[in-house]
Amino acid sequence: MPEIIGSNLEKCILMMVKGSALRHLLKAKSSDSMSNRAQAMKMSSHRKYCSISLALKKFLSRSKLFGISVGTEHISLDKATDRILARNIQCPIDIPPFQRSTVDGYAIRSSAAKGAARNDQVVLNVIDKINAGKDSRAKIRSGEAIAIATGAKIPAGADSVIMIEDVIIEDMRKKIRISHRIDRGSNITPRGGDLRKGQILLKKGTWLTAADIGLIASVGKSRLLVYKKVKVAVLSTGSELAEPGSKLDDASIFDSNRFMLSSMVRKQGGEPIDLGICKDEKSVIRAKINQALKFDVILISGGSSVGEKDYVPGLINEIGKPGIIVSGVAMKPGSPTSLGIANGKPVIVLPGYPVSAFVAFYTFGRPLLYNILKSSGPPVARQVAKLTSNVKLHRGMTTFVRVRILRRHGCFFAKPVSAAGASLLSTLAYSDGIVVAKYNNRGLKREYMLHKGQNVEVVLLREVYQEA
């Protein structure tokens, strides 16, 4: 059902309902759909919206009471991207495990170059060469040097490395001339200079990125203990929905929410379980919800509002206590979102409009999965940008504004795509990010607007490089 925005228009309609004029008008209308729509508007006007912060607090605290646990498993390092560590990882060795050169050059004793100057150069004999991965049995004495590659082990007797660019090479690379002094330890990474044995590399709950996996590989570990993926049942409701790839009739639309939500679940550490499309029939929806209770979390798209065919919240209440704990959230889009617990399983009832469903999962689905996985989640890319136009906010609501990011002369600008149109998935697909604008109702002066030129923080949905 479409979201109904509270406004003066609604108040007028409700006043008319009480008066005879609209009663006679409604009697004159034979269409059941008109009657249903008026009833839905009346019910919506009495709906109290919960703030996002309070709704999330209620939902997560109730979810914790049921102690959802997904267990752990060992996996190979090559499968660890975007998985969550189930225990701390300690460094088993010093990294590097030996002193190594940070440059291509010559390993020497720093004392040998103590008196070197442009007009009083020091000559050293080159006695060996060490490539990365090799060692030298030679021990450097005064007046000697060993050619060394970046990353190679420092030979015995040497305490510094002089860069190849800072020497004069003579006699078929058998001698070098040095014209300046060099400090002890120059161009050398000491043993354990990066990581020390016993050091905590990564903590339990870390969301593993490419850099983390490289770090783990650098200390020789090939298998990890991680949390199992949260199994999330994903169900779309609506008699108008058709499966992508099927033939579309005149009164149907393709189901996009199920695929969008499944993709979001995967990205946020879950394993989506596709329960398909469910027609707007109470008994069928009940059976699907009972099937979904086998899994850890339930996402239901559609049927969250107050229309005649919006059965889902009532069924959640019937199936298991405490049932729906939040009905309606003060956010646009996504205000008809409901949150509940059925037989110990968290349930998010998302609006049928695609943008609303996206925002609702972003707001409640992500934190729920992170909570179950005992993680703060993956890094979130953000960009500060200047608005290119004014944006009107919904009173008493947190507004999620879709924007394009433009880059001009090194500066970033946020161009609003749409503050409305929750049914228009293209406005989300063509956006680079979202501005989360909290309504400020403190004090006598109330701001209903984000202003052109104002700096805003954009939560990026994709990487942005282009220069506009």
Descriptions of predicted regions:
Residues 2-120, 147, 190, 375-400:
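Short, low-complexity N-terminal leaders and the immediately following helix N-cap/first helix
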Residues 5, 252, 258, 267-382:
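Short glycine/threonine-rich loop/turn motifs
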Residues 34-37, 41-42, 100, 117, ...:
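C-terminal terminal segments
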Residues 36-53, 106-274, 279, 418, ...:
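Short, glycine/charged-enriched hinge/interface segments at domain edges or termini
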Residues 47-54, 72-75, 79, 103, ...:
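Conserved active-site and cofactor/substrate-binding residues in soluble primary-metabolism enzymes
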Residues 68, 73-77, 98-124, 157-173, ...:
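Short beta-strand/loop turn elements enriched in aromatics
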Residues 93-94, 130-135, 185-190, 435-445:
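Short alpha-helix capping/helix-loop boundary micro-motifs
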